[in-house]
Amino acid sequence: MYSQQFGTVPREFKGPTPKAVIIRAKPPKAQRAEQHLKRIQRSYHKYHTTLASIKSNEENRLKCDWIQRNNHKTFDSLVQARVQDAMQGFVINTEERRNKLRELLASEENEYFSEMQLKGETIEEKKDKMRERTKLLREKKEKERQEFVAEKLDQQFRERCEELRTKLASIHEKKVVEERNAQIEFNKELKRQKLVEEHLFARLWEEDRLAKERREAQEEKRQRELVQNTRLGLDAQVTSIQAQRQGARRMKEEEARILEQNKAQIKREDEQEKLQKQKRRQETRSSLKKAVQDKIESMQREYREDLDLNMKLVGRALQDLQDEADKKKQKREEMGREQKIYNDYLMQRREEEKAQEKELNRLLEDIKAKKLAEKDRELALQRAARKQLMNEVMNTRKLQVQERLQRKLREQEELALHEQRISESLKVLHQEDMEDFARRCALAEEYRNQLQMQIAHQQQAREAEKEEERQEFEAGLAANKACLDKIQRILSENQALSQNVHPMRRGYPDKPPL
């Protein structure tokens, strides 16, 4: 498996010297049956684990669905109850408000009747008062309308009068120029104050810088003294630390010497132990060879009781190996039985699949035969329908030919009748033309008379138009005079408004608006 993944793996590895070589141990041989059994067991375990997981997930899903369904039912019932309570409360509140409104209207009506009774007014007096009030309201409304119309006319005059707009623009321009000059002066004053403030800040900054330099010099001096004192303390500490280090170095050298001695002692002990192990291994190997030879010579002979402890241990180890071999053999037999059961199961599944496939083929053949029969029936029905349609088309064609012949005969009869009507119409038209000529002559005479009357009327209209133009000219002169008067009045009002200074300007006369 390793060689399949990573290619051929060399067994020899070179050491630090030219002739030093390390050989990798051979990998153990793969046990196919055990690996196959383990794969089957893993797949079986995985299958059952998946089934258990699916079952638990299904149970959890059903449980969650049941919980959600119960929660939805509980929530729906709670919402329904709250909605019913709210609707019932709304209905109760509506009824209460209606009752209160009825009581209030009844009390107001009673108060109104009692007040009417106390005043002793009659219906006629009340009607007179209502008429007077209506008249006052109408007059007030008419007055407001006239004021509104006058205001709009004045506004329209202000918007359309070019001379007024020119004068107002010149006045506004002069005012803007004055305010701009004042603003420029104010900005110059601000710049001058800003320069003064900058000089003051520069002086304060210089003083602060000098004070900071003095503080830094004092701090530097204090730091130098502190560093000097710290250096002296550190020198003393370094001296003591060096002495401690020398003592520690001597102790380490002593410990290293003792450690070397211990290592040499341990090395000697290891060599002795290695020799003893080799001796014991040789003894064990010889005893094992002897035991194997005895076992080969007589398998049924009882073990001798006078063997030493090492032989007993070897026999016990061999017995364990034999038990393990028996267990492996039994395990292989069980695996063989399981493999046989699995193969039987696979054969049964294949036979069942073949039977299902045969049944499916049979069903497909039946469905195919049914479809072919249905298709044959449909084709027979289509042929019958096509034949019937052809017969209907031929009959319809015959009827159309007959109708066309009849229509042609009717058209010939209608054409003869139409020619007869045309001749009669020509006679009637000639008679109407004669009557029309006589009527036109009468209309021409009447038109001539009306034209003469129209000329006389136009002369009168021109004279009236001249009179109207003269009156309009006089009215225009009067309107021009009124317009000039109005312009003067508006300019005087504008000057009066310009003299009314805003409270902020009165409070700060030296600061023009920005």
Curated annotation (Swiss-Prot):
Protein location: Cytoplasm, Cytoskeleton, Cilium axoneme; Cytoplasm, Cytoskeleton, Flagellum axoneme; Cytoplasm, Cytoskeleton, Microtubule organizing center, Centrosome, Centriolar satellite; Cytoplasm, Cytoskeleton, Spindle pole
GO biological process annotation, one example: cilium assembly
Keywords: Cell projection, Cilium, Cilium biogenesis/degradation, Coiled coil, Cytoplasm, Cytoskeleton, Developmental protein, Differentiation, Flagellum, Spermatogenesis
Domain of life according to the entry: Eukaryota
Gene deletion effect: Smaller size at birth and laterality defects with half exhibiting situs inversus and 15% showing heterotaxy. One study showed that mutants develop hydrocephalus around 3~4 weeks after birth and die by 6 weeks. Another study showed that 72% of mutants that survive after birth die within 6 weeks while 25% live longer than 8 weeks of age. 9+0 cilia of the embryonic node are completely immotile and are shorter than normal while 9+2 cilia within the trachea and brain ventricles differentiate normally and retain motility but have an abnormal beating pattern.
Positions of region (Disordered): 261-296, 495-514
UniProt xrefs under InterPro entries: CFAP53/TCHP, TPH_dom
CC annotations in GO: 9+0 motile cilium; 9+2 motile cilium; axonemal A tubule inner sheath; axonemal microtubule; axoneme; centriolar satellite; ciliary transition zone; extracellular region
Tissue expression pattern: Expressed predominantly in testis (at protein level). In embryos at 8 dpc, specifically expressed in the node, in particular within the pit cells that are located at the center of the node and have rotating monocilia on their apical surface. In the adult, expressed in epithelial cells of the trachea, brain ventricles, oviduct and testis.
UniProt key word Coiled coil: yes
Residue ranges of coiled coil: 91-176, 205-478
UniProt keyword annotation of Coiled coil present: yes
Pfam assignment, any one: TPH
Subunit annotation: Microtubule inner protein component of sperm flagellar doublet microtubules. Interacts with PIERCE1 and PIERCE2; the interactions link outer dynein arms docking complex (ODA-DC) to the internal microtubule inner proteins (MIP) in cilium axoneme. Interacts with CCDC38. Interacts with CCDC42 and IFT88. Interacts with centriolar satellite proteins PIBF1/CEP90 and PCM1. Interacts with dyneins DNAIC1, DNAIC2 AND DNAH11 and with ODA-DC component ODAD4/TTC25.
Record family assignment: Belongs to the CFAP53 family.
PANTHER family cross-referenced by the UniProt entry: CILIA- AND FLAGELLA-ASSOCIATED PROTEIN 53 (PTHR31183:SF1), TRICHOPLEIN KERATIN FILAMENT-BINDING PROTEIN FAMILY MEMBER (PTHR31183)
Cited function: Microtubule inner protein (MIP) part of the dynein-decorated doublet microtubules (DMTs) in cilia axoneme, which is required for motile cilia beating. Regulates motility patterns of both 9+0 and 9+2 motile cilia through differential localization and recruitment of axonemal dynein components. Required for centriolar satellite integrity and non-motile cilium assembly. Required for motile cilium formation. Through its role in the beating of primary cilia, involved in the establishment of organ laterality during embryogenesis.
The name this protein goes by in its record: Cilia- and flagella-associated protein 53
